[in-house]
């Protein structure tokens, strides 16, 4: 997992509350157990007018040219609600999103996003409103998420955010559960060497 310190990118506004995991990645695309290849199905039922995913919906924000290459998703409250499928953050990451900004996230989605190297940023509702207004006035604007400073910076706006220190440490250093365990590889090997061979 790659460490996250700062990221500056185009922000795309998804002006919907309670976006659930079935909207993020519909159930018919959950047939794989690796993380690659889900991005093309992200928001499938909103991005496309047909089941085969061949006819883009020109009204959907991700299909609008000013947001091409967006890597920051701006959303409303309770993002990622619904089922606990880890495929949801996989799809967002595979599409190219590095961070998601919203007033609140579903708890399981929040943890899954962090475990997959994405930074879910919780801002106050009025701060999210200000970002939506900024993007409406300047479509395609880039904003910066700084995990070292715990700040979101955009134009003249600067908002602080909070994140659990352990999770912040993991994101900054690119550590998932396996990476954390491997930090103690020498101690684990030393412990195992002292155990009877039949254990």
From Swiss-Prot:
One of its GO terms (molecular function) is 3-isopropylmalate dehydratase activity. GO terms for cellular component: 3-isopropylmalate dehydratase complex. Signal peptide: none annotated. The keyword Amino-acid biosynthesis applies. It comes from the Bacteria. Disulfide bonds: none annotated. It catalyses: (2R,3S)-3-isopropylmalate = (2S)-2-isopropylmalate. GO terms for biological process: L-leucine biosynthetic process. InterPro entries: 3-IsopropMal_deHydase_ssu, Aconitase/3IPM_dehydase_swvl, AconitaseA/IPMdHydase_ssu_swvl, IPMI_Swivel, LeuD. Its EC number is 4.2.1.33. It is an enzyme of class 4 (lyase). SUPFAM superfamilies: LeuD/IlvD-like (SSF52016). Keywords: Amino-acid biosynthesis, Branched-chain amino acid biosynthesis, Leucine biosynthesis, Lyase. Catalyzes the isomerization between 2-isopropylmalate and 3-isopropylmalate, via the formation of 2-isopropylmaleate. Belongs to the LeuD family. LeuD type 1 subfamily. Heterodimer of LeuC and LeuD. This is 3-isopropylmalate dehydratase small subunit.
